[in-house]
């Protein structure tokens, strides 16, 4: 299956954020990445504790983001880090997370992240996206180069949707990351069904 990672952004959500999170978790993406890095660490930790419980009840992995201290305090097993943050961790700190993701924007960054212990990568942004307004996407060829360069799973990010799964899968990606649609769509379950239907035709 071509996996979907949900990337959260509470600023886009109209209803209470935890209600949206529960609805997305019930739709069963491969994982939910709690990317609320504008929060102070104490507020992030409080939110993450609730998110971890919601995801646990739904049977969906919850990946914390950026805040290593909060993740360790909560006993989280998975974290996703910007490369500059990953660079600051000791080997012992990295070993605390069996699932350690990193964001990369070049083949060189992908190599470095893997050397620092990353178990999966996100690569992007592949297509134009509202998150990177005004910047052209790096393209599917960039994604293919990253996928070919590293031994770990690579997830495409940036403008990803069911309509471009064939190109992403052909490039070698394990899955894709979705932010805005899952934060704003009327029915996360329907979106996941659309994704899975598209994935079934490309693999």
For each feature predicted by the language model, list its residue ranges.
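Active-site mouth loops of central-metabolism enzymes
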Residues: 1-18, 98-104
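Short, well-ordered coil/turn segments that N-cap beta-strands
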Residues: 1-4, 28-30, 58-60, 75-77, ...
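Glycine-rich phosphate-binding active-site loops on the catalytic face of alpha/beta enzymes
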Residues: 6, 82-92, 122-134, 165-198
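Short secondary-structure boundary segments
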Residues: 10, 36, 83-84, 104-107, ...
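Alpha/beta enzyme core
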Residues: 16-31, 74, 84, 107-124, ...
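Conserved beta-strand positions in the central sheet of alpha/beta enzyme cores
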Residues: 33, 63-64, 80, 101, ...
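Alpha-helix-loop-beta-strand connector modules within alpha/beta enzyme cores
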Residues: 45-64, 83-86, 91-106, 134-162, ...
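Catalytic cores of alpha/beta
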Residues: 62-77, 105-117, 149-150, 154-156, ...
